[in-house]
Each structure stands twice: as C-alpha cells, then as structure tokens.
Amino acid sequence: MNTKKLTRLASLCAICVVTRINFSIIPNVQILSDIILILAIDARLDESLIVNAITMTVTSFFLGFGYWVLFQVLDFGLLGIINYFLFNKLGLVKNDISKSLAVGISGFLYGLIITLMEVFLVSGNKFSFLGLYAGSIPFDINHMIGNIAIYLLLIRKLEKYITGEKIFKNID
C-alpha cells in the first residue's frame, strides 16, 4: 500500500468517524454507508472493508461497544461484497441511477440483516423477529432515503476523489 492510498484511506476513515458521531442524532443517516458502498461498487472492495472496520471500531469508543458493533461490521461488509459482485462480476451498469438504487436498497437491507443477526443471537423466535423488524422499518426507510440523498447531493460529486481516481492538488 503506497502513501497516497494510505493517506486517502485514513482521510476517509476520519471523515466517516466524524460524520458518524456528529450525525448520530439523525437515526440511520450516515455518510459512512455511502462511502463503503461506493468503494465496493467502484471495485475497491479491500478499501471498503478497511474503512468499514476502522470506522466502526473507532466510533464505538464514542458511541459504545457491544455485540452490535460486530454485527454492523459484518452487515456493512456483506453489503459491500454483494454490491461489489453485482457491479464488478455480474456487470451491472455503473451509472447514477443504478448506484442510487444500490445504496438505497442496501440501506434498507442493512436493517433486515441486523435484525436477523440480533434474533439469532438473542432468541431465534420468528415472532420476536417480526416485532423487531416491524419496529425497525421506519429507521430502514430513513436509512434508504438518507443514503440516496447523500449519494446524489455529495458522494456523486466527490466519487472520483473517494476512489482515488483524482487527487487534490497542493496549492503552492
């Protein structure tokens, strides 16, 4: 890993940590989701997994540790892998519409996967799953809408910098 890539990843982790902590008052609206998924969609799965693991670990010092941290890392990792394969192995067209749909659907699926993991850990009862999932649907919708809005308003414009295709120039 060269210095430019390491610096870019460290910067992405810092952005994700700061925004995750500061946006924690808005349920499930996170720049982190979009950055992890866009890295995976743009064939940088290794970077996606690194940013995911580091961000979740560091933010847990501020927001609290628990079994859910592992679930979040696994969930975002799984969604990153799924998007990586859809766009890079199965050849899904990479345009703004498909990326918006991918980050939106991934935001919704995030809640489903987290709920499944919690039910298997806590009780394994189908009724507890239905109750937990019904309670999480408004947050999942919020996550989906937030991901799409963040992608269209911010990430789309910065995508080439996030993926390292463009670099910021020094002003001398």
Question: Can you say where each PLM-predicted feature lies in the sequence?
Answer:
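Membrane-embedded alpha-helical hairpins and interfacial helices in multi-pass inner-membrane proteins
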Residues: G66-L70, L92-D172
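Hydrophobic transmembrane alpha-helices
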Residues: M1-D42, D46-I50, I54
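Hydrophobic side chains within alpha-helical segments
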Residues: F23, S33-L37, D75-L78, E118-L121, ...
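Hydrophobic alpha-helical transmembrane segments
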Residues: L6-S11, I38, D46-A53, L70-L74, ...
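Structural signal for the C-terminal ends of transmembrane alpha-helices
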Residues: I41-D46, I82-G91, R156-T163
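Interfacial aromatic-anchored transmembrane helix boundaries in multi-pass membrane proteins
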Residues: V17-I31, A53-F87, F127
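Lipid-exposed faces of alpha-helical membrane segments in multi-pass integral membrane proteins
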Residues: S11, I15-T19, I54, V58, ...
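Transmembrane alpha-helix boundary and packing residues in multipass membrane permease domains
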Residues: L37, M56, G80-Y84, T115, ...
